[in-house]
Amino acid sequence: KDNPKKQMARQMIVMVNTINRTNFGGRRVVTCVTCHNGSNVPATIRKLDAVYGTPTTDEPGNITRQAPGAPSVDQILDKYIQAVGGADRARALTSWVAKGTYIGYGDASPVPLEIQAKAPDQRTQIVRTLSGLSTTTFDGRNGWFAAPDAETPIPLRALAGSELEGARLDAQFAFPAGVKQFLTSWQGSIPATLGEDRDVYVVQGASASGLPVKLYFDFETGLLVRQIRFVEAVLGRNMIQVDYDDYREVAGVKMPFKWTWAWQSGQGKIELTDVQANAPVDAARFARPAGAAR
């Protein structure tokens, strides 16, 4: 027999699904976050500091129209291409090889990392953990994850669903020249603020599965500073956030040397120390891994 918490969770799932089915045609308009927002007990009284204190910046909802006075999606993406070095230089970047470090949430110290990427959408990331090599590969169509037995119950598995889609986006965004083709169904742009004082424009498109993907571009520099994509789950959509920082010029193209991935159950940070542009990359680098190696 399941414990009371599991029984309650199942009852809540049924309740939320019933609300959405009855009132919104089955669309996931109401989720656990709508009421609980991270708390075991939903708040029923509004706090006064929410009325009289400094307003907090919430994640913008779905963008459905162009904000008055904001630049168009094309203008924002064109400025981004100019910011990284211009269309000609961006197109001239066809591959790159990088070294750096990776640290996960709760890890004691960073470990060595290598990335090989080839335009338009191939990417392999190798993290040298204490247990062995952890490899994520996307060959332009298929993806795999290989890791030591000590870190995963399945040493080699094919990526599917949201994991495969995320690997594709990471491979595509390694080469900014094609940014307009990465997503479809662009919805317009809105101004927003990250943190306390970073003004950005947010544009929204759709991934191959139709889920929204939001891109955040700095007001002044035009550079991409954040990507947010979504994963469909039983309890609603989960968010995956990728932050880009420390842009440096490599062969005339500005590239982020710091990336931070954050999701519901973890976080990973990459810091690159060396990037070689247009370095030769063997096609075998993007093949299905043989399995975890030491």
Predicted regions and their residues:
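Sequence context of c-type cytochrome heme-c attachment sites
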Residues: K1-R27, K47-T64
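Short Cys/His-rich "knuckle" micro-motifs
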Residues: P42-R46
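Intrinsically disordered, low-complexity terminal tails/loops enriched in metal-binding residues
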Residues: C35, K47-D78, R294
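Acidic/charged, solvent-exposed loop-and-adjacent secondary-structure segments enriched in E/D, K/R, S/T
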Residues: F145-F173
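The canonical Cys-X-X-Cys-His
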Residues: K1, V29-S39
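N-terminal helix-cap/turn-to-beta initiation motif at the start of protein domains
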Residues: G69-D74, I81-W96, A174-Q181, E196
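N-terminal mature ectodomain segment of secretory-pathway/periplasmic proteins
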Residues: I81-E151, L183-G188
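Gly/Pro-enriched, hydrophobic low-complexity segments
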Residues: T124, T129-G132, L194-A292
